[in-house]
Amino acid sequence: MNTKEYILDQFKTYPHLELEDLMKFLYQSTFGCEHLVSDQDTVKKHIQQEFDTQMDSCNSIEYLDGDYVRLHLNYGLSVNTLSTLFILSSQQEKNGIKQLEDKIQILLELISNHTLPFSLEESTNILLKWKEDGYPAIHHSNTFNQMYHPSYRLIHKKYVPFLELFKYIDDKHPSILLIDGRCASGKTTLGILLKQVYDCNVFKMDDFFLQPHQRTNKRLESPGENVDHERFEQEVLIPLSKHEDVNLSKFNCSTMSIQSPSLIPYKPFNIIEGSYSMHSNLQKYYDFSVFLTLNKEEQIERLKKRNPNMLNNFIQRWIPLEELYFNAFSIQDKCNILIDTSKA
């Protein structure tokens, strides 16, 4: 959708809106929640107050004309999760004024040709005054508040693919959550995000590459056997299943040896992240499993940006090995949820 279509969709969704509501829509589309963010305790307090008093029955995700969405409080996220995503979404927008003024021009054109039922002269004066004042943040009109009882927070649209996962975590409180999937699909990025949102440990399969003596032709030719899942089970999953601390010994690729162990205190919520982590010998330990995927074109583009010198190695070796593992054990079908990150 383009700016014109977004504006008309707003009018269709909220037929009683006023000009200032469209101004707010354009402001939010451009600047997101940058002007609203304070400390997390204050943000959480305000969200909790809205939870307790809100009359908004909408539970949808409302896309804006830019990088943000309106996530209505009734969607189902906890106060802590929503407040954290809200704060993570705040950022300084480059060229924001230029973007906003381009959108305002389209709004005026829709008013000028009578597509929108507002006075052109009055609207022009209001918008010029807004510009003179430096484009301050706009409130919803009294009419909009009375008719629609809006209750939402702005978050970046890159978090939308993971909202159902956040909702599951908030509702079910899993102890061990798995993230497997295709290379460059965002497994590490999701693990980092979950650690920002929740009090959890993240354990990576990349720390459990095979030691030199394990790299036999027989093993490397077997689907899913090119990681040390045996050591991962003993060092990480068995202690976690017993609610015990983990003595983590990472494999160092530069020295091709295992490092000295470091103590990871037990936490009730733990993330297992990486390719081959859904190995058939490990599945019994997981409360919930996520499979991340993406289209081939996006995968190649991300790998090229990550390390162009390694691209051919991924195409010729690592991607075929992953696909062999996925197909041999129906990994995608066995995971609880599939998330396509192609557009994330």
What are these regions (language model features)?
Residues L190-G191:
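Post-Walker A alpha-helix
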Residues M1-F144:
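Long, basic/Gly/Ser/Thr-rich N-terminal segments
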Residues K187:
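Conserved lysine of the Walker
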Residues N201-K204, L210-L263, F269-N270:
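Conserved nucleotide-sensing/catalytic segment adjacent to the nucleotide-binding pocket
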Residues M147-K172:
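N-terminal pre-Walker A segment at the start of P-loop NTPase domains
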Residues H173-L177, K267:
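Pre-Walker A (Motif I) flank of P-loop NTPase domains
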